[in-house]
């Protein structure tokens, strides 16, 4: 079975996006948005040529082949993040005790969950905004991983351990992530 001598992935850079590569650090800028990420793996080189980001690896092993594809996805997500951004939609569900959800600073506060007297909190990652309106929660930002982690933090804050989720359906649930309806 022949092995490829060179793996090369290319990513088109849109006109309004600037990509800088300093050693192993990739910086993607567009307007006021900027994302920076450290991408370093032995044998893999990242460069820019003719309006494209090029990821290359000579005589790759399985792990290096996988990492080249992973880096391509990371850079593509960075470009999408600074141009369009990412948005997760969550919905608040309750049967008897109405929840009060609010975002202040870098935390989301959930009051009166299942009639509890204390406030449950969820962390908001850097560069992410959370908007609560009625029974809808919208999490948005440029960094896909931070937006997803913030949405997961909010969902996990309302998990009830030891109860059947088919019966006890109170909570905050992700219904749409990065444009995909679940």
Swiss-Prot record:
Origin species: Methanococcus maripaludis (strain DSM 14266 / JCM 13030 / NBRC 101832 / S2 / LL)
PROSITE patterns documented for this protein: RIBOSOMAL_L6_2
Record's subunit section: Part of the 50S ribosomal subunit.
InterPro entries for this protein: Ribosomal_uL6-like, Ribosomal_uL6-like_a/b-dom_sf, Ribosomal_uL6_a/b-dom, Ribosomal_uL6_arc, Ribosomal_uL6_CS2
Name under which the protein is recorded: Large ribosomal subunit protein uL6
Organism domain of life: Archaea
SUPFAM superfamilies on file: Ribosomal protein L6
The keyword Ribosomal protein appears for this protein: yes
GO cellular component: cytosolic large ribosomal subunit
Pfam families for this protein: Ribosomal_L6 (PF00347)
Role according to the record: This protein binds to the 23S rRNA, and is important in its secondary structure. It is located near the subunit interface in the base of the L7/L12 stalk, and near the tRNA binding site of the peptidyltransferase center.
Gene3D superfamilies assigned to the protein according to its UniProt record, in alphabetical order: Ribosomal protein L6, alpha-beta domain
Single biological process term from Gene Ontology: cytoplasmic translation
Keyword annotations: Ribonucleoprotein, Ribosomal protein, RNA-binding, rRNA-binding
Family: Belongs to the universal ribosomal protein uL6 family.
Keyword Cytoplasm included in the entry's annotation: no
GO molecular function: rRNA binding; structural constituent of ribosome
NCBIfam families: PRK05518.1, uL6_arch
């Amino acid at each position: 079975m022949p092995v490829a001598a060179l793996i090369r992935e290319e990513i088109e850079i849109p006109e309004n996006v600037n990509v800088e590569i300093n050693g192993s650090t990739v910086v993607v800028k567009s307007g006021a948005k900027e994302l920076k990420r450290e991408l370093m793996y032995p044998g893999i080189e990242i460069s820019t040529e003719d309006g494209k980001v090029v990821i290359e690896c000579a005589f790759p092993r399985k792990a290096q082949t996988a990492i080249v594809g992973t880096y391509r996805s990371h850079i593509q997500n960075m470009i999408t993040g600074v141009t369009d951004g990412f948005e997760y939609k969550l919905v608040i569900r309750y049967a008897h005790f109405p929840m009060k959800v609010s975002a202040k600073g870098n935390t989301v506060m959930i009051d009166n969950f299942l009639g509890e007297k204390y406030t449950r909190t969820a962390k908001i990652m850097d560069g992410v905004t959370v908007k609560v309106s009625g029974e809808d929660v919208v999490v948005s930002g440029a960094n896909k991983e931070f937006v997803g982690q913030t949405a997961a933090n909010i969902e996990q804050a309302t998990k009830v351990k030891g109860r059947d989720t088919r019966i006890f359906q109170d909570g905050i649930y992700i219904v749409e992530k990065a444009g995909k309806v679940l």
